[in-house]
Amino acid sequence: MTPLTKHQVFEIIGHLEPEIRALGVSRLAVFGSVVRGESGPDSDVDVLVQFLPGSKTFERFLALSDLLEAKLGRRVELVTTEALSPFFGSHILAEAQDAIRAA
């Protein structure tokens, strides 16, 4: 499997924006090896997600994860802004690049 580039990931997510927004997502950002240009053939895609108030449910979280994995063809590590580690959260926020921004 060839590594995904940041451009490819953002292009795929861009095409999925209507479906992603329909799940109540207000912000979707990519971080980690893909953003740094260090992803390998077996790398996952690290994604930070923020839902609209009252829209975050377990079912929507899983649906988003499944959608991204199916379309990216890779495992996706999906993390919500609320679940960020106090130790690594600031690093992730600094590195994250928005693919979908709040409207």
Where are these regions (language model features)?
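Short hydrophobic/aromatic beta-strand micro-patches
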Residues: 48-50
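Catalytic core of pol beta-like nucleotidyltransferases
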Residues: 1-27, 35-41, 52-103
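Conserved histidines in hydrophobic membrane contexts and catalytic metal-binding motifs
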Residues: 30
